């Protein structure tokens, strides 16, 4: 199975919007309202989110997931790709380069956001 950055982004957006049940999310993947992907595809991307340090959580023996929170890195990544127009440009840039890593996607999205902020404010950012 391959990493699907569109699904990764969608999962982060969904998780961020979910209310916490106490200090945990107990996630039944079928209840997330993601109909364009199979249960196995969603589960695999959840494992990648945890392995990649974007989500603090674990898979339960039942096959569900328990998550404590999006990590700082998870919030940073999501903030860099939240805007649909920035996300589309980020993916286009990655495709033109012939490949990508999550760090490259984040850096590309961050660069696009930086450019957009500089255009809106007239303030040059040194990031």
Mark where each language-model region is.
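Basic amphipathic alpha-helical segments that dock to polyanions
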Residues: 41-53
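Short beta-strand "wing" residues that participate in macromolecule-binding interfaces
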Residues: 57
